[in-house]
Design a protein with these regions (language model features):
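Residues forming the flavin
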Residues: 1-53, 57-183, 187-530
């Protein structure tokens, strides 16, 4: 196959034109191209008067490929490599995966395809049950600490924008994207420069992945929470599990620990049992909402109506040495209630696949290091998160309403009494206040400098009517569960800390990739034991 890069089309142009452009680049006739698929697509909006899409396509052509690529500097011969999946004999003691977010799901998929018949323990419910409970909570219903945005099938990423872009360049990424597409996501996620699925589609995709895992001999147990572990001669030997019918012991010699960044009781249990872990830097801040049409105009100008909902990514390093950045930007989305503990409030952002909501939202986060934590213990960052969420719960009225403030009032140091042009989307509701009374000064001082700095980079970002909803505390794990080069815990052989909760990923795709890596290590260990 020949890959041809830097082919350009105007917004709205028929992608069938790519065949003609590819033929022109290779100096052949369009009918000489026997096959074409898009390998990458990105939007170049750097120049307002020349906004266009840039494509890389893969083509098969009649003729000698080596000779043809010499005709075009943007062409190269490529050969896609399939992700290798070994086959093993079914082990006597089945591998166990704790958690069924992206890391646990892709670990289970690989182990199931390899014939290892994994058992998945997920403390939350299946995606359909979870969706109904979250909708009821957002409408004012009761909070469930085991069924929420953090816990349940698909993990926290299911109720987000479903963004799949990642800063890593692991070869496994192509496999992850292809599997999402094969299980119900749109094909364009395999080539978009900024792929996203959307919550509405992702809820279906994760169920399809689960069905394949079960069809291949795996087992998924919902409502099963790990409460302890035991070892034999230093090696993991069993898990204590709280299930719907009571507590039980599950023998296990290979355990992938993919618990997510919000399983605080599990962090405490692991720490109490001596599993090596350490505090790590993470970030906290607020969610900011603008009208999506204002972001579109700022990014695209007059071309906005012909283009999809605009996104942004901003960062700044401030004179006092602090830094801030935007994260998990959700075009046309909503701010979501993301609490996982009773008596706490925290936020997240989500978008559906169409990204057609009135508002844009993003986290505005302040980078925090262990030396910033009031509590210097291993779990000090986690306890700081919890205390801020509890303060927000109280300031919001004790009913899971979130504290909110207009950006103009925040910068002026006065409490807000209601919305302006931007209507908040957080449900069950917001309580207008002064966020300086909710968040630590370490965070508010940095945000007060960052908002105007971002406004200089993106017109209108510091719009006085922009809504700040707090707190955003769960951007990443506050701890790292230490593992070695074999991906095993340095203190408990057979235990594989994995994904975002263990401190080795940040986002859906990188977590899924880490799940594959850990599953590969488990398969290697099982083959050595055979």
């Amino acid at each position: 196959m020949i890959a041809i890069s830097n082919l350009k089309l105007a917004p709205g142009a028929d992608e069938a034109q790519l065949r003609t452009l590819a033929a022109g680049a290779l100096k052949v006739q369009p009918q000489d191209i026997t096959g074409l698929r898009i390998r990458k697509k990105s939007l170049d909006a750097r120049k307002r008067d020349d906004i266009h899409y840039v494509y890389t396509v893969g083509v098969t052509v009649r003729g000698d490929e080596r000779k043809l690529v010499r005709r075009c500097r943007a062409a190269a011969i490529v050969q896609d490599k399939a992700y290798p999946i070994p086959r093993i004999a079914s082990p006597q003691t089945r591998p166990v995966i704790v958690g069924f977010g992206p890391a646990g799901m892709f670990a289970a998929l690989l182990l199931a395809r390899a014939g290892a018949r994994p058992i998945v323990l997920e403390r939350g419910p299946d995606a359909q049950t979870r969706s109904a409970q979250i909708a009821a909570f957002r409408a004012g219903g009761p909070f469930d600490p085991e069924c929420n945005v953090q816990f349940g099938e698909g993990g926290a990423g299911t109720f987000s924008d479903g963004k799949l872009n990642t800063g890593t360049h692991d070869a496994r990424i192509g496999f992850v994207l292809a599997e999402f597409a094969a299980h119900g996501a749109p094909e364009h996620i395999t080539y978009d420069a900024k792929p996203h699925i959307g919550t509405d589609v992702l809820v279906e995709v994760v169920q399809n992945l689960r069905r394949e895992i079960i069809d291949r001999g795996g087992e998924v147990r919902f409502g099963h929470r790990v409460t302890g572990l035991s070892t034999e001669d230093g090696h993991i030997a069993a898990l204590t599990v709280a299930g719907p019918a009571g507590s039980y012991t599950l023998p296990a010699r290979q355990v992938i620990l993919a618990i997510g960044h919000s399983a605080r009781d599990t962090f405490e249990m692991l720490h109490a049992q001596g599993v090596p872990m350490e505090p790590k830097p993470f970030s906290m801040g607020v969610r900011i909402e603008h009208r999506q049409k204002d972001i579109n105009a700022a990014q695209y100008g007059a071309a906005a109506e012909r283009l999809p909902a605009a996104d942004y990514s901003l960062s700044c390093h401030l004179p006092d040495g602090s830094s801030a950045y935007t994260f998990c930007m959700c075009p046309g989305g909503e701010v979501f209630a993301a609490a996982s503990e009773a008596g706490g409030v925290c936020t997240n952002g989500m978008s559906n696949s169409r990204r057609d909501g009135e508002n844009a939202n993003a986290a505005v986060l302040v980078t925090l290091r262990p030396e910033d934590f009031p509590d210097k213990s291993t779990l000090g960052g986690m306890y700081w998160q919890r205390s801020i969420e509890q303060r927000a719960f109280a300031r919001g009225g004790g009913n899971y309403h979130a504290p909110a403030q207009l950006a103009g009032d925040f910068l002026a140091g006065r409490a807000s009494t209601g919305p302006g042009r931007v209507q908040p989307t957080y449900r069950p509701g917001v309580t207008w206040c002064d966020l300086h009374d909710v968040l630590p000064a370490r965070i508010t001082d940095t945000l007060a400098q960052a908002l105007p700095a971002f406004g200089r980079k993106l017109r209108g970002f510091d719009d006085p009517d922009a809504v700040l909803t707090a707190p955003e505390t769960r951007s990443s794990s506050p701890v790292r569960i230490v593992r070695g080069e074999d991906r095993c815990s340095t203190g408990v052989p057979g235990l594989y800390p994995c994904g975002e909760g263990a401190g080795y990923a940040g986002g859906i795709t990188s977590a899924a990739v880490d799940g594959l890596r850990c599953a590969e290590s488990v398969l290697a260990a099982l083959q050595n034991e055979a």
